């Protein structure tokens, strides 16, 4: 009988903070600038340059720590993590090892077995490295230091997760908390949220941890789930074959759905940490912590409760809408403009979610304006267009953020209410479908629906459904 194994997973989640300037200098953190245009002597490691801590980085780190139930180190320090790599111009990274800003927190996730608490070992602040570019020249790599010195927090979990599903639930919970705080946009595709997966397997029932590996290059939740499954199987196969699992860092190739070894996995002592002599310790007062708490924005749980109370949404609807901060922001903006909360929720939950699924997009990637969705709701509500045409218009809003009023006029999509025209078209449909007329008179209600559908198709969806039903019933007798 084959052995049963348990997967043990911990995560190191790196989050780029939404500050306008870097952690230790005044250079811009804007994404996508020309290479090496957001740099200065500090973030490129020039001799004699001195770092100055960005206060906003501290405030974001504290806000995240408080939101995930952490204890705050009211006396924290920065340390130097020493290593040599081309994208690290100082040959060390300023981080926190001995006294990180936050420790001993947790978040709760939903699992099939119920609520599960995932421990957070610590949160520390650090600076990001530069970026190596390998595809510009054949015989060398280039370095872009725009990212060097961009502020990060690293959220280190306890090894409390046991499956890919639990990992994704944890990451989604973290992402929502951080987005609602405004601390980061957490866009995996742009690298503002990155997760390294530490994974080991052991025999079910054992309390002894196996040898862990670290998985890198994971830029989507789907890639993370696939990497976990692939690494779990790889380690089990090694154990079954009597081979050792090597403690190493591995790079995931999502196209090949496999990983390869990058280097042996380092321990803290390999980096020869020591206190940074250029940065004084930071003392965090009770007053400062209280001020952060008092300014903390509405998080998802409170927003859900408010939507049910203020907008009379069901718990299910409120849960779906608040599942993305961007979608919740659009919902509130649309509702503020048109005053129709349930209609706004319906368009977002049904049509927007359908298109997101079709295009394999995250809600954060939606670019249409709240004003245009509010205009569409008004056009449908006042009968200018029917809902069928409204869906067509929404697809254009979703894809191109078009002005729906202008689009409806240009394409001639207004509802046809002219009784004579409707009667003429319906008479033609009735004459062309004698079998359906006979079926209707023999009690087959589906035949009526067929005739309505033929009428709407003939009029390209622009007919008033109520008028079509009324006139058709008159003609059928």
Stretches with model-predicted labels:
Residues 1-298, 315, 336-340, 350:
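Basic, nucleic-acid-interacting segments
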Residues 301-308:
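Extended, structured, electrostatic nucleic-acid-contact surfaces
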Residues 337-338, 344, 352-367, 375-380, ...:
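M16/insulysin-pitrilysin zinc metalloprotease superfamily fold
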Residues 268-270, 304, 358:
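Active-site lining segments that contact anionic ligands and/or coordinate catalytic metals
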Residues 190-203, 308-330, 341-358, 371-373, ...:
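Core structural elements
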Residues 363-374, 378, 387-457:
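Strongly charged, low-complexity linkers/loops
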Residues 18, 198, 202, 233, ...:
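Amphipathic alpha-helical core segments of compact helical bundles
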Residues 445-477:
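Short, amphipathic C-terminal "tail helix"
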């Amino acid at each position: 009988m084959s052995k049963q194994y348990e997967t043990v997973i911990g995560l190191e989640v790196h989050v780029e903070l939404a500050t306008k300037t870097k952690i230790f200098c005044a250079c811009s953190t804007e994404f996508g600038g020309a290479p090496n245009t957001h740099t200065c002597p500090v973030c490129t490691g020039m001799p004699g340059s001195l770092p100055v801590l960005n206060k906003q980085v501290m405030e974001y780190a504290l806000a995240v720590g408080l939101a995930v139930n952490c204890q705050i180190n009211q006396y924290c320090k920065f340390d130097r993590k020493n290593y040599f790599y081309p994208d690290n111009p100082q040959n060390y990274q300023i981080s926190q090892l001995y006294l990180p800003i936050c420790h001993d927190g947790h978040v709760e996730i939903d699992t099939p077995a119920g609520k599960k608490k995932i421990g957070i070992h610590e949160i520390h602040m650090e600076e990001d490295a530069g970026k190596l570019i390998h595809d510009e020249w054949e015989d060398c790599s280039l370095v872009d230091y725009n990212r060097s010195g961009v502020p990060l927090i690293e959220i280190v979990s306890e090894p409390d997760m046991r499956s890919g599903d639990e990992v994704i639930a944890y990451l989604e919970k973290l992402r929502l908390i951080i987005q609602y705080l405004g601390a980061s946009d957490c866009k995996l595709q742009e690298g503002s949220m990155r997760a390294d997966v530490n994974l080991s397997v052991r025999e079910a029932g054992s309390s002894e941890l196996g040898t862990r590996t670290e998985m890198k290059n994971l830029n989507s939740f789907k890639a993370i789930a696939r990497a976990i499954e692939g690494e779990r199987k790889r380690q089990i196969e090694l154990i079954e074959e009597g081979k050792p699992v090597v403690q190493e860092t591995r790079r995931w190739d999502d196209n090949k759905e496999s990983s390869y070894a990058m280097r042996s996995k380092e321990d803290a002592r390999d980096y020869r940490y020591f206190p940074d002599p250029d940065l004084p310790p930071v003392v965090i007062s009770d007053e400062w912590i209280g001020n952060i708490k008092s300014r903390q924005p509405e998080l998802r749980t409170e927003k859900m409760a408010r939507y049910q109370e203020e907008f009379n949404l069901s718990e299910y609807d409120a849960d779906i809408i608040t599942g993305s901060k961007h979608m919740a922001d659009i919902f509130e903006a649309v509702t503020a403009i048109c005053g129709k909360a349930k209609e706004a929720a319906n368009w977002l939950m049904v049509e927007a979610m359908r298109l997101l699924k079709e295009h394999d997009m995250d809600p954060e990637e939606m670019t249409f304006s709240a004003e245009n969705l509010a205009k569409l709701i008004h056009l449908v509500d006042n009968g200018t267009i029917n809902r069928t045409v409204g869906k067509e218009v929404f697809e254009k809003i979703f894809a191109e953020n078009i002005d729906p009023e202008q689009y409806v006029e240009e394409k001639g999509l207004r509802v046809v209410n002219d009784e004579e025209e409707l009667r003429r078209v319906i008479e033609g449909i009735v004459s062309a479908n004698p079998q359906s007329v006979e079926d209707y008179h023999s009690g087959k209600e589906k035949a009526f629906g067929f005739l309505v559908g033929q009428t709407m198709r003939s009029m390209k969806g622009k007919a008033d459904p109520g008028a079509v039903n009324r006139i058709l019933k008159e003609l059928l007798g």
